[in-house]
Amino acid sequence: MSKISIIVPCYNEEECIELYYNEMQKIVEQLETEFEYIFVNDGSKDKTLSIMRSLAQKDPNVKYVSFSRNFGKEAAMYAGLKAATGDYVGLMDVDLQDPPHLLLEMYNGIVNEGYDCVASRRTTRKGEPPIRSFFARRFYKLINKISDANITDGARDYRLMTRTMVDAILSLEEKDRFSKGIFGWVGFNIKWLEYENVDRVAGTTKWSFKKLWKYAIGGIQDFSTAPLAISKFMSIMTFLGFLGLIASIFICEWTNTFYNFNVLFLSSMLCLMTSIICACLGVMSSYLRKIYKESKNRPVFIVGETNTIVK
């Protein structure tokens, strides 16, 4: 009999875990397959870990991995993928914003329709702040234009994948991970299920605008070198502009033209060019930071406690 592993990252989700488990059990009963939960505690400060322990004592199909500190959702998903033993592996959020009933369609899509992955995307962003929705849409359009990653607008991490696809994802051992980009980069035959946005069942989101901005910038850096090309172009244009302004000084001197205004103009242009150069250096230094981080070869996460095996 085949087996499904569902990875559930958790960070301060004490209000959601049992609600999620109870809803999922209704779905599990309809699946004619073995099933395991892999809850990943991402350094929570509340009772998340103790609830995981309690569920594991009641249900042998509940596995948990607890980090020594907060490493982020990307690390939690990676740890879950490494711990999963199923023939089919899924990712879900614990707040029930990922409708559990879609798992039945996902399983059918892989087993009966031959897909390697059945993923989900939101058709609406109802309930989100307008500014957040605006930047999210711009991000998807931008990263698809400047990178070789294929990320569907509104794509969620919620998906079910074959073991072959999961092994391909795990073969990419980069430390600073951007899973949405990785899912698209590895390819495979993917079917998309659409649904309208669902509110959290309890608790509050852990994704602030600052975290989302950092996540987006990290994704662009992971899958595109376009910012470096833009920096190079800006540097060349700045240098040409500088040469043009120097030439104008010589022309004014040669023709005895009064140019005090030009001096002020040159000063302002030099300030502008300096700021552009600093911006270019900032872009390049961010890429160097990523290279430095990879070169240290530190683990993506550190396990503090678990009741399963993490490869």
Q: How should each PLM-predicted stretch be described?
A:
Residues M1-E128:
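Structured catalytic core of nucleotide-sugar glycosyltransferases
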Residues K180-K311:
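Hydrophobic helical membrane-anchoring modules
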Residues V65-R69, K73-A83, Y88, P100-S179, ...:
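Acceptor/aglycone-binding surface of glycosyltransferases and processive sugar-polymer synthases
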